[in-house]
């Protein structure tokens, strides 16, 4: 935590990139290192993010036929008292997208959830149990909230000792 290197060694920070104390989604290592939602760390996705993805990311694992039709999305998060916009191909949902709260940040509730869609996610394994899943947050101090195994929002770091899943979205 709070470290970075100049020799190419990765120091994965769940909340932000490198030693920058900025918890906005735009600066979250997960966007680049795991999701491949952008191909420039800490920056907006470029037009080649989907067609020339960062190696060993979720984006690179998607079929090329899907990646070629994917479209970027403008994502809104909160940092240091202001709205931060980022351009992403595989973002995580925000609590407002699911529960309809905090719409002042331009995050809208998706019709699927507005119409009663499930907020519980299941493990992709033989027991198919209900699991925690990560969301973008609008907090100044963390980059993630989670949905608990009960389908309810849990804010902040209480969950950091639990294993959580991710359920990114994309647009075609």
Predicted regions and their residues:
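Collagenous Gly-X-Y triple-helix signature in extracellular proteins
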Residues: 1-172
